[in-house]
Regions:
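Short, extreme N-terminal segment that most often corresponds to the first beta-strand
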Residues: 1-27
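Aromatic-residue detector
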Residues: 8-9, 26, 36-37, 53, ...
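A common structural junction motif
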Residues: 17-34, 88-93
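Charged interaction segments
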Residues: 40-194
Length: 194
C-alpha cells in the first residue's frame, strides 16, 4: 500500500492539482474528472500492474486536521505528482510504501521531501535478493539501530513504518476514519483518445 502525507491545507492541495500543467489539456477536453466522493481506500491497496487509467484521492480527517492524505492506484504512489505538489505549495511530504509480504513486489520504503526536494530516503525491498539503501540525514523519529540488522528485510519493514508513523502522531489504522473532505481524480480517457 502506497500513501503520502502532506503538511498543507486541503484547499491549497486541491488548487495545486487543478493547476497542474500535466492535466491542463485533459481537463479542458473532459478526459479527467475531479470530484468530491466518499473515500474508498480499498481501491488503492495492491494496485494493478501495467498501463491503466490513473485514479487518486486526497482527503482530510478530523483526527489529523493539519494533514492531507493521498493514495493512488499506481504502484509508485504517483511520486512525481507528489513531489510537484510539495514544490508548488512549499510543504513537507512523507511517502510510504508499506508491505506485509503478500504482494508481488515486496518491500517497504520511506521518503521525506521538503518543498519538492528530497531530504531522506530509506528502502528495503526484494529483487533477486534483499536490497537496503538509505540517503539523507536521519529524522528525529528514526531508530538507526534498525538499519544495521543482519537481516536486510528487517531493517525497514511494516512494523518499523507503523512505529515511525506513530512517532509522527499518525495511526495507520485510522487515516481513513472521520473523513471531513475527500476529492478524487479519475482519468476516463487517454490524452491521445478522441
Amino acid at each position: 500500500f502506497n500513501f503520502s502525507v502532506f503538511e498543507c491545507d486541503f484547499e491549497s492541495f486541491t488548487e495545486a492539482i487543478h493547476n497542474c500543467k500535466w492535466y491542463e489539456q485533459s481537463l479542458l477536453q473532459n478526459k479527467v474528472l475531479i470530484r468530491k466522493q466518499p473515500l474508498n481506500l480499498d481501491e488503492y491497496i495492491n494496485p494493478p500492474h501495467g498501463a491503466h487509467y490513473e485514479e487518486y484521492s486526497w482527503w482530510t480527517t478530523s483526527n489529523y486536521k493539519d494533514k492531507i492524505f493521498f493514495a493512488s492506484n499506481h504502484r509508485d504512489g504517483m511520486s512525481s505528482l507528489c513531489k510537484y505538489v510539495s514544490r508548488e505549495l512549499g510543504c513537507k511530504l512523507y511517502r510510504f510504501r508499506i508491505s506485509k509480504g503478500e504482494e508481488a513486489y515486496y518491500g517497504c520504503t520511506f521518503f521525506c521531501c521538503n518543498k519538492g526536494k528530497d531530504e531522506r530516503a530509506i528502502l528495503a525491498y526484494m529483487e533477486d535478493r534483499w536490497v537496503f539503501w538509505q540517503e539523507g540525514e536521519l529524522l528525529p523519529f528514526e531508530n538507526p539501530a534498525y538499519y544495521s540488522n543482519r537481516f536486510i528485510k528487517k531493517r525497514l519493514n511494516y512494523d518499523i513504518l507503523v512505529e515511525y508513523l506513530g512517532k509522527m502522531g499518525i495511526n495507520l489504522f485510522d487515516i481513513d476514519s472521520n473523513v471531513t473532505n475527500c476529492m478524487t481524480f479519475e482519468r476516463i480517457k487517454w490524452d491521445r483518445e478522441e
